[in-house]
């Protein structure tokens, strides 16, 4: 465990964006419920998930 909160590993925000010419574009989707950036998961089922509010969008065919 880190001694201070500052010593803990933080997310690298610069990996969330792509620079295209003079525009900055977000790589991932934004959560429609709370507005934070969602994570894309492939296993066990492909889905977009929000770590802040728990919102999940499943991708692909339903069984």
Swiss-Prot record:
Pfam families: Ribosomal_S27 (PF01599). GO terms for molecular function: structural constituent of ribosome; zinc ion binding. Belongs to the eukaryotic ribosomal protein eS31 family. One of its GO terms (biological process) is translation. SMART domains: Ribosomal_S27. A zinc finger (C4-type) spans 31-53. Its cofactor is Zn(2+). It comes from Sulfurisphaera tokodaii (strain DSM 16993 / JCM 10545 / NBRC 100140 / 7) (Sulfolobus tokodaii). Keywords: Metal-binding, Ribonucleoprotein, Ribosomal protein, Zinc, Zinc-finger. Zn(2+) binds at residues 31, 34, 50, 53. One of its GO terms (cellular component) is ribonucleoprotein complex. Binds 1 zinc ion per subunit. This is Small ribosomal subunit protein eS31. Part of the 30S ribosomal subunit. InterPro entries: Ribosomal_eS31 (IPR002906), Ribosomal_eS31_arc (IPR022845), Ribosomal_zn-bd (IPR011332).
